[in-house]
């Protein structure tokens, strides 16, 4: 929830500043409402799965900051795609930088004895399919963000994640969770609210 909150709030600002290839978009009541509905969708979806364990405030804050970074990353990926003309370039850059940092951190942890290296594969082979999914996701979003903007992309991603959770629950666990179903409905409502074209601008920032 903290991550989605940070992502939605940041998406409004990123679009307002025009960091993404879709250009500058005003902060309107309609867009703010769409972002709030999107966050509410996640809150409702996970409401039946939260336990009573207290989560440290620093961890919540870290997730919020990570959400902010997601929106900025999506905007930058879109710019990279525009400059290069190839969505896979953005995906390649992300994974080169990410892999380099992970290798560096892992090397330090091995040297100080925090972790011990293990032979690969160290888990089920299907886990490694996540890397392929990541490449497809980043390549796709780097292209889509230029068409719809960062906020709408974020709302679409939230909707897709909740639908994916719904399908996995049905296929793997054999049941449907009522809060998750309601969360999916709210997520698509957020997309619809953000997509509807207002008759006149209601900008809160003075940007037409």
Model-identified regions with their sequence ranges:
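Helix-helix packing/entry segments at the starts of transmembrane helices
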Residues: 1-9, 88-97, 135-169
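Structural signature of hydrophobic alpha-helical transmembrane segments
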Residues: 1-9, 54-69, 118-134, 179-186
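Hydrophobic alpha-helical transmembrane segments of multi-pass integral membrane proteins
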Residues: 34-37, 61-62, 81-130, 160
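C-terminal ends of transmembrane helices
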Residues: 10-25, 72-84, 136-148, 192-200
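Membrane-interface helix termini and inter-helical loops of multi-pass transporters
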Residues: 43-57, 109-123, 166-178
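Hydrophobic alpha-helical transmembrane segments of multi-pass membrane transport proteins
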Residues: 65-73, 111-151, 192-193
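C-terminal transmembrane-helix exit sites in multi-pass transporters
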Residues: 8-30, 162-180
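Juxtamembrane helix-loop boundary signature in multi-pass membrane transporters
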Residues: 12-68, 184-208
């Amino acid at each position: 929830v903290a991550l989605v909150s940070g992502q939605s709030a940041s998406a409004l600002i990123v679009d307002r500043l025009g960091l993404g290839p879709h250009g500058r978009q005003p902060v309107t009541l309609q867009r703010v409402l769409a972002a709030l509905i999107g966050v509410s969708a996640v809150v409702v979806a996970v409401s039946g799965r939260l336990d009573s364990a207290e989560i440290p405030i620093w961890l919540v804050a870290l997730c919020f900051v990570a959400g902010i970074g997601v929106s900025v990353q999506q905007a930058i990926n879109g710019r990279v795609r525009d400059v290069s003309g190839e969505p896979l370039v953005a995906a390649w850059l992300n994974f080169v930088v990410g892999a380099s940092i992970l290798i560096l951190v892992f090397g330090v942890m091995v040297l100080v004895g925090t972790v011990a290296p293990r032979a690969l594969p160290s888990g089920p082979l299907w886990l490694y399919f996540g890397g392929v999914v990541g490449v497809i996701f980043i390549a796709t979003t780097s292209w889509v963000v230029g068409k719809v903007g960062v906020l709408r992309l974020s709302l679409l991603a939230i909707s897709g994640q909740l639908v994916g959770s719904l399908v996995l629950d049905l296929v793997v666990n054999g049941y449907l969770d009522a809060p998750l179903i309601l969360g999916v409905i709210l997520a698509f409502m957020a997309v619809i609210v953000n997509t509807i074209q207002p008759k006149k601008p209601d900008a809160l920032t003075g940007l037409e």
